[in-house]
Amino acid sequence: MIEATTDELLDYLADVIERAERFGATVLPPNDAETVAWERDGDQLCMDLAVHPPVGPSSRLVEIVLRERWRAAGSDRWELAEHGYELRDHELAYRRALHRHDVNDFVRTYGVATHEHCEATMGNPACGHSLANPPCRGALDGFDRLYGVWLSGTKPDCSQLRCLG
């Protein structure tokens, strides 16, 4: 389980933004908010970022979405409960995602807590859930993996992933 203090989470968010901007991407806050910040949802902290890699003016939208939910784990302690990191390339019409959610259900059904989605044609998955190997270690890792997929300039080969069902 990944744990952090509030100060570590503030630094972490700054690191994620800095990483994306270093690659020339634009980082946008969710839901037309004025700033990018952690949002509180009950006893959870939530990160929701839209990252737009640099594309030409006539290109269609490319977006990397980075979402995390951290739950309270003690005095000034948080643990990563869920994540969803997604690349949607509307120019090449594919989607790639790294997820961790509904952990108990996934462990019970598939024996793993994390999984991937791969759609070589967006909206047409060859498999509902694929094994995330290795599991994603957070938003920086998720961003690096998905940005690398986008930089390749080709659709991902989803047949190389092990289908969970």
Short names for language-model regions:
Residues 72, 120-123, 159, 164:
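Short amphipathic alpha-helical "recognition" segments used for binding
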Residues 77-141:
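An exposed acidic His-Trp-rich patch
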Residues 71-77:
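Short, solvent-exposed beta-strand/turn "edge" segments of beta-rich domains on protein surfaces
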